[in-house]
């Protein structure tokens, strides 16, 4: 009996020790997961919502070796700088933001990155910059010129749509008078008259940002389209003009059968501190899941229809900017690489 008890006690100690050892190892293993910080625009913006919804897909694509955290900033411009200052790995950006960074103009004037510069990595969806006002005030506005010099919220300062409106107004010769407000105050500011208009935007002609969904539920709005002569000037400046079916994006009547906007292409870019293999794996996962992504969010519809073409479009918008080796490898495999482009590194 002594021997039996001694055996049982020894076995119990062995099991307990094994359990303790395993529980000690598990946290250590968890701690070994690397951090992948995804810098986006403000909470409530479309860019933030997309990143937050894709963290699980990214973590799975990288074999569980990384923990993805979404870090919101006041604008994509600030998010881009944060990544290049070493405070993140993936930067939310757009074609116009990449142009300004490359040329060191606008918010990037005099800017010197502390980390590798972000390069073409992944382009995800187009957005269309559109102008709106209240139904009660709509009769005062016939064209975009009627907003010139008047207080308007052109999305957050530094947002890519904000930059887009600056280049639109430059092409039209209009005065850009921006009033900065909190995203959640959009409806209140419109109702109070502290702003007479507010720039809205659709993603792929379908999805609305969260704060605009709230705005249209709280009040009746009207879309104000550019007049034909304004459209001609915008196109003459080299910018595209697209038509959007408002029924695809808005839940209520907005006063027009077709909304007219100026598009920009958004993406999430990284620097060479992120390896070729990581970017290649992510692109492969996004490509494989493109149809499911489009079902989850209609904003991904254009990407699902032509994933490769969207990457080509993003590069061609700024052909002087280098392409991440991971994207270059992906495009070469899909016979879509151009020798006119250069690979970063």
Regions found by a protein language model. Give the residues of each.
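Bacterial N-terminal signal peptides that target proteins for export
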Residues: 1-15
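C-terminal segment of classical bacterial N-terminal signal peptides
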Residues: 16-28
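Bilobed "Venus flytrap"/periplasmic-binding protein-like clamshell domains
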Residues: 33-61, 66-69, 127-194, 203-206, ...
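Sec-exported extracytoplasmic/periplasmic mature domains
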Residues: 55-63, 84-88, 103, 136, ...
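Short, hydrophobic alpha-helical packing/hinge segments within bilobed ligand-binding/sensory domains
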Residues: 76-80, 186-189
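Pocket-lining segment of extracytoplasmic ligand-binding domains
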Residues: 95-97, 104-113, 119-120, 135-137, ...
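Ligand-binding clefts/hinges and TM-proximal coupling segments of bilobed small-molecule sensing domains
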Residues: 143, 148-167, 238-308
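An extracytoplasmic/periplasmic, membrane-proximal ligand-sensing/linker region
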Residues: 185, 202-223, 233-235, 277-345
